[in-house]
Curated annotation (Swiss-Prot):
Active-site positions on this chain: E138
Known tissue expression: Highly expressed in the liver.
Name of the gene: Pank3
GO CC aspect terms: cytoplasm; cytosol
Subunit comment: Homodimer.
Protein family: Belongs to the type II pantothenate kinase family.
Subcellular locations according to the entry: Cytoplasm
Catalytic reaction equation(s): (R)-pantothenate + ATP = (R)-4'-phosphopantothenate + ADP + H(+)
Organism: Mus musculus
Protein name, entry field: Pantothenate kinase 3
Pathway annotation: Cofactor biosynthesis; coenzyme A biosynthesis; CoA from (R)-pantothenate: step 1/5
Function: Catalyzes the phosphorylation of pantothenate to generate 4'-phosphopantothenate in the first and rate-determining step of coenzyme A (CoA) synthesis.
Amino acid sequence: MKIKDAKKPSFPWFGMDIGGTLVKLSYFEPIDITAEEEQEEVESLKSIRKYLTSNVAYGSTGIRDVHLELKDLTLFGRRGNLHFIRFPTQDLPTFIQMGRDKNFSTLQTVLSATGGGAYKFEKDFRTIGNLHLHKLDELDCLVKGLLYIDSVSFNGQAECYYFANASEPERCQKMPFNLDDPYPLLVVNIGSGVSILAVHSKDNYKRVTGTSLGGGTFLGLCSLLTGCESFEEALEMASKGDSTQADRLVRDIYGGDYERFGLPGWAVASSFGNMIYKEKRETVSKEDLARATLVTITNNIGSVARMCAVNEKINRVVFVGNFLRVNTLSMKLLAYALDYWSKGQLKALFLEHEGYFGAVGALLGLPNFS
């Protein structure tokens, strides 16, 4: 899909999604610059492009996800590469100051942004960076960004995938999924919290519901229970733990399956239910607590998503958001839960650019104000 516009915005082209935990940035690097353009290009623009494309880390917390870079695509009639950068929201003032130091406001006075932080930090952009924010609706950006990324080739790879044999850990494997005909689609966006959208076409979508129990809940509870310092550390601990040490299962209550209502003995009856017993609290490890927290949050998201899919009569559920970044554990849990509890009627889908769709949607909004 090529997006063209008679009046192209001036470079540099950015889209920002300022979330409660992470800032996601999409940056378009033009590769079709003419000799005349290069001669006229000001030093500050060259400096910004070189800084962003020649580094994979910015300061101590900024990361460019090189493996997600989209090469040689066409946007607004220009050829270029699309880069994806993230950093903690708490470091946003440092980012704004960096833009000021590189004289960003001499090139652009308005930034295209979405997410709650576009409102929360609007004054900081204005007073520190001499920049104004063109604020776009985050759910609009999410849908537009998702559909755009799905429509362009991911450097010859599949953007969408699922897990085959999700119920068998030794046979479970990642498989490509063709999303050329995406509608209808249930989109479950897992960030700090969770929003669920029913998408029937590129212009026909609605927010169905959401839950406050999301990625922020997982990291917050893990920090309290285990003392972990980061999302990556929390996931590492969870990967080594056993949630059944903290959770109370159906078999712990019934001695086996609860056959009358079709509940298998391994199903969780009460998340953290074993923690009411002193002897269990004395033997549970921090890794077990991290795993139980991950399973609790993931199971809840899967349960809400399944009910929404049934109510909306949609059988394809795509999970996106930065909660799923480097979090194969939760993806496989979601894949298995949806397949098992729907008796194979629902398929859990995932996307490679999971957390960046809002930022891409903001980038696509550039011509609206340029």
